[in-house]
Amino acid sequence: MSEVKVSLKGRVIALLLGCVFLVTISEFVVRAVYPSWSEFYAGRYMVTESVPGHGIVAVGKAGFDGYFAQNNGDFRAHIKINDFGLRNDDPAVAANQRVWILGDSMAFGWGVEADEMYSSVIGELINTPTYNVASPGTNVCGYQALAARMPKDISPAAVVVGLIIENDLSNYDCPATAKAAESSDRASTGSTFNLGTIKQMLSKHSALYNFFAVSLKRVSIMREALIWVGVIKKSHAYRNPLEGKDMEQIAKATANELDRLRNMFDANTKFVVQIAPARFEIANDDPAYIAARLRLREALTERGIPYVDPIDRFKADGFEATHFIHDGHWSAKGHRIAAEETAAWLRSNLPQ
């Protein structure tokens, strides 16, 4: 009986070792024949930085020059980060008296080439140099941090803040948030080992995982199966993080922090908020997001903060024409629409 048990145990061990060997060999083979596997991980070109008085903010990895792609085939874009951690060819000191574009992933140009992102298109349209001061994963408090870390001996000719309705509206208190971050050692007190972190880890380290992710996501029946079991999310699935919250207070708090951002610059510096309307309003006239956008506009007006709202242009051109198929970000067409609307405001308000 013991011999049978040993035999079964040995077979199981042999099977496991064989699987490990097969996966290891496959990993090395895929790395050799599929060198672009690492392009799907955005963390390759992003780092975090502590900004005194503003806490932690995400910025680009200085000197990065490579490609970033979506494994669903939406895009493959060249990303070049300068020595200051921003997506510009010129150094930060060259930003003096340019039009600064502050924002998160949309302003950063997620998925589009550098000459297609709206900061670049604005510069072409108004024949005035611009400078991209944007970083994925930030919010209004992060925009304050990005502005604060710019060289102290330079200043903008104007500031455009890209504000995303879906992500950037919150009951902010940026000074309190920064103070809490600086007084904390930011140590994790609980486990974050879940499906999301596993996928992120595999995206970062495994060529084999990325190969299968690309292959499966591009086969319709397999993609639907993965959505059904919860491994991947449905494209443009409805989400509203503001649901059930006090929209009046959220709009007011957001406008207050945008005003704080405006006051970080000289009083004569032209300042405008470019509103990025929600996907679900553009595609389906979602009433919750319509209400959120209109309440934000009211709060900005109460604060005397100018804004550009390109909702009519986006609705005229349509959701599919202005966004990536699976990703929630603007395509090159969406960037151009936003740039044209904002450029019109700048032409009317900047000295000629």
Predicted features and spans:
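N-terminal Lys/Arg-rich, disordered targeting/topogenic segments
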Residues: 1-8
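Hydrophobic membrane-insertion alpha-helices, especially the h-region
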Residues: 13-28
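Membrane/wall-proximal cationic-aromatic binding patches
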Residues: 33-128, 239-241, 314-318, 325, ...
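Conserved SGNH/GDSL esterase-like catalytic core that processes O-acyl groups on lipids
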Residues: 92, 108-187, 191
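Short, amphipathic alpha-helical "lid/cap" segments that border enzyme active or binding sites
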Residues: 140, 144, 251, 255, ...
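Serine-dependent acyl-ester chemistry module
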Residues: 164-297, 310-319
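Catalytic His-Asp segment of secreted/periplasmic serine-dependent ester chemistry enzymes
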Residues: 281-352
